[in-house]
């Protein structure tokens, strides 16, 4: 089967745009939402598709309450994938790859292959920052493409969307950032005040488990616009040399997104 990448023409770069992926979950009955967060997408899928959704994240299940169609698992993703007995015909990953190291993603995709039903569909939505931000974040699009191509079996097609968007804010000076290994830099994007509060809670929780480090007291900052919360994975010894970074440094200026749809008629390992 061809594993081609082609222009898809859908916007995947804002909070509203991510709901496009709900359309691609229609027709499936056993759906897994990895990195579900508040459960907003899980609920939208369950209500629109009438399907049962298993939602997996460390916590924050606001929108999954009182829904008979959603089962929420407060677990690490790879822990869940390696222990669950459930099988799924649709697996959703919305905006989680940028929070994970390459090694974690490799293991996650390997685990996913063990829980796929025949004719399974994998839906991956991913926002990422454009070149205007320089090397402080994983700006190279090929990282996401190669992670998918190299760690998942071939499917019917891989569909890819890229849409630049200009936001208000100040351009960054890449000289403000020194000594950062940006290839494996982990970050999380917040689109609104509610998600910003959730991201801060998640950061504090991860920090309490010694999974990451926090810089510039981000967990105490109010929401001031479309923002990036920097997280450093504990497996990499990274640090900021310039400690006088301006507050505006993590306000996003330009960003893009991608949507990947992979359909399987049979699973090849």
Model-derived regions, located:
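Class I SAM-dependent methyltransferase SAM/SAH-binding core
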Residues: 38-79
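Class I SAM-dependent methyltransferase Rossmann-like catalytic core
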Residues: 1-18
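A short glycine-rich, Lys/Arg-flanked "PGG" loop and its adjoining helix->strand segment in the class I
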Residues: 106-118
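A conserved beta-strand element that flanks and buttresses the S-adenosyl-L-methionine
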Residues: 92
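Conserved class I S-adenosyl-L-methionine
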Residues: 29-37, 123-150
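Conserved Class I S-adenosyl-L-methionine
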Residues: 201, 205-207, 215, 219-265
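Short catalytic micro-motifs in class I SAM-dependent methyltransferases
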Residues: 95-96
């Amino acid at each position: 089967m061809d594993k081609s990448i082609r222009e898809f023409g859908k916007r995947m770069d804002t909070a509203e745009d991510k709901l496009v992926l709900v359309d691609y979950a229609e027709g499936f009955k056993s759906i897994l939402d990895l990195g579900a967060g508040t459960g907003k997408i899980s609920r939208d899928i369950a209500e629109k598709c009438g399907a049962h959704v298993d939602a997996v994240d460390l916590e924050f299940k606001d929108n999954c309450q009182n829904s008979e169609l959603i089962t929420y698992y407060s677990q690490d993703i790879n822990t869940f994938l390696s222990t669950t007995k459930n099988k799924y015909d649709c697996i959703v990953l919305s905006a989680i790859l940028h929070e994970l190291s390459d090694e974690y993603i490799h293991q996650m995709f390997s685990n996913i292959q063990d829980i796929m039903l025949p004719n399974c569909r994998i839906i991956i939505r991913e926002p990422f920052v454009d070149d205007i931000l320089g090397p402080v974040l994983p700006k190279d699009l090929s990282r996401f493409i190669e992670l998918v191509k190299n760690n998942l079996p071939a499917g019917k097609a891989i569909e890819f969307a890229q849409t630049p968007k200009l936001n208000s804010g100040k351009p960054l000076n890449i000289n403000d950032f020194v000594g950062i290994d940006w290839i494996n830099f982990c970050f999380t994007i917040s689109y609104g005040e509610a998600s910003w509060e959730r991201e801060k809670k998640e950061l504090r929780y991860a920090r309490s488990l010694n999974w990451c480090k926090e810089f510039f007291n981000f967990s105490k900052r109010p929401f001031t616009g479309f923002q990036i919360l920097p997280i450093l994975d504990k497996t990499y010894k990274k640090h900021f040399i310039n400690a006088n970074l301006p507050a505006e440094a993590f306000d996003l200026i330009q960003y893009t997104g991608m949507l990947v749809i992979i359909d399987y008629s049979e699973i090849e390992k």
